[in-house]
């Protein structure tokens, strides 16, 4: 890594990758930004287009299309490459196809001498983050998945809309698989400093069945969006930007990334969406919430499904 210069390499210039790339340039997050894609002409075109936006950015960024060799001096490699989720297809349906793709990508990156942090977004993200960790040989702290950062953002937005509160003042987490078995941590949800359960108890207009419907809409959001426009990319692009800023700026921010469990939440040897403190070293620590019995059971089920799905492809 070059001292004093933040280099981020993006592998995959599809809709998700380009949404992330645009947000990176828009906010001037890194000094160097490299785009890599199997379709070299596409990566080159995107780099050209993005570079023309740099004069409008808050700080200058050198943008170019490159290769895995550019990962050698990278602080962060973000992977969005892979086959997208089709209408009616679950994230876990993608596991076999994208695992093969990922193993090749990670090997190519590591051959460059890369020694930074991986941030994974390709689905099924928890499984592919685990695959990246295994293939790379890097410490677990330096391999991170986008996890349930987007799910938690959707959750906060919808709760804020329901309660007529700025979603930035809604503190609520979605944990577990980024997918069908994820779960809301109702027991720790707060609006400002007030517990959501207290607000419910003191206001007749707010009902638990409405909250349950909100969670269903959060869990199924990708399906609804894919049915209408074919893919999701703006939300995940901003989620990746948020994690990137936490890493490069050494923020020690708590984000629900896919992190490796070693006994936390009663689970081991799995990458799962949980609150974690993120800084320049990657995952500084996992924040272990005290779940109620129902939440514990649902979390254990989510991890079990991930492990069962992952086993045949490792």
Curated annotation (Swiss-Prot):
Enzyme type, top EC level: oxidoreductase
InterPro entries noted in UniProt: L-lactate/malate_DH (IPR001557), L-lactate_DH (IPR011304), L-lactate_DH_AS (IPR018177), Lactate/malate_DH_C (IPR022383), Lactate/malate_DH_N (IPR001236), Lactate_DH/Glyco_Ohase_4_C (IPR015955), NAD(P)-bd_dom_sf (IPR036291)
Major site of localization recorded for this protein: cytoplasm
BP terms from Gene Ontology: glycolytic process; lactate metabolic process
GO cellular component annotations of the record: cytoplasm
Keywords: Allosteric enzyme, Cytoplasm, NAD, Oxidoreductase, Phosphoprotein
Residues that, per the record, bind substrate: 85, 91, 123-126, 151-154, 232
Catalytic activity: (S)-lactate + NAD(+) = pyruvate + NADH + H(+)
Residues reported to bind beta-D-fructose 1,6-bisphosphate: 156, 171
Active site: 178
Pathway given in the UniProt record: Fermentation; pyruvate fermentation to lactate; (S)-lactate from pyruvate: step 1/1
Modified residues (Phosphotyrosine): 223
GO MF entries: L-lactate dehydrogenase activity
Localization per Swiss-Prot or TrEMBL: Cytoplasm
Assembly and oligomerization: Homotetramer.
Family stated for the protein in its record: Belongs to the LDH/MDH superfamily. LDH family.
Protein name: L-lactate dehydrogenase 2
Gene designation: ldh2
């Amino acid at each position: 890594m070059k001292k004093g210069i933040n280099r981020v390499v993006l592998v995959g210039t599809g809709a998700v990758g380009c949404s992330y790339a645009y947000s990176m340039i828009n906010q001037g997050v890194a000094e160097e930004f490299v785009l890599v894609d199997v379709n070299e002409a596409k990566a080159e075109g995107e780099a050209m287009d993005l570079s023309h936006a740099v004069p409008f950015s808050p700080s200058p960024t050198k943008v170019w299309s490159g290769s895995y060799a550019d990962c050698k001096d990278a602080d962060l490699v973000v992977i969005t490459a892979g086959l997208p989720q089709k209408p009616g297809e679950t994230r876990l349906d993608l596991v076999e196809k994208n695992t093969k793709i990922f193993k090749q990508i990670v090997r190519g990156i590591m051959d460059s001498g890369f020694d930074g942090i991986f941030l994974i977004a390709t689905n099924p993200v928890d499984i592919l983050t685990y695959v990246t960790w295994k293939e790379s040989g890097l410490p677990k702290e330096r391999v991170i998945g986008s996890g349930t950062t987007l799910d938690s953002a959707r959750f906060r937005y919808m709760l804020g809309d329901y309660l007529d509160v700025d979603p930035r003042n809604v503190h609520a987490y979605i944990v577990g698989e980024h997918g069908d078995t994820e779960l809301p941590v109702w027991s720790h949800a707060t609006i400002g400093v007030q517990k959501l359960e207290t607000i419910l108890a003191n206001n007749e207009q707010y009902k638990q069945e409405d909250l349950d419907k909100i969670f269903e809409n959060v869990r199924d959001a990708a399906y609804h969006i894919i049915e209408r426009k074919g893919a999701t990319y703006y939300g995940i692009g901003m989620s990746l930007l948020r994690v990137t800023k936490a890493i490069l700026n050494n923020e020690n921010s708590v984000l629900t990334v896919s992190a490796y469990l070693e006994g936390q939440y009663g689970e081991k040897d799995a990458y799962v969406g949980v609150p974690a403190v993120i800084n320049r070293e990657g995952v500084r620590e996992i924040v272990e919430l005290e779940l109620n019995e129902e939440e514990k059971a649902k979390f254990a089920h989510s991890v079990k499904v991930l492990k069962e799905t992952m086993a045949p492809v490792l």
